[in-house]
Amino acid sequence: MIFPKLLSYSSSDLEMGFIPSDPQHCLVPVTATISPTGSAAGDNFSFLVATPSALAESGKFGWGRGILIVDSFTWAGVERSLNRLLAHAARDTWQDVAQALNKELLWEFDGYQPG
């Protein structure tokens, strides 16, 4: 059984340790690097951390894949949410783990076809 592990996570829009000016009204893109436990290299999975009010104001409508909806943004909350997701994603192969995570997050290799 392959168990996924969170190696790192960050945002291109918000430096780690800082919070948005209004943590209850924000959209923060995040990329998480996730690997099989024991591996130093991982795959990138991206998602948007969004509050309901910011999501409504942005006019972005969709089914919700790749969006973590929170009442208020905190880095600790993002990490907790990721770890909860990973706790339920163990599978027989890394490919199966990544496909399971890809149902909620946006996997960098989604749709990739080797040439």
Describe each model-derived feature in a short phrase:
Residues 80-115:
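Short, compact, well-ordered microdomains
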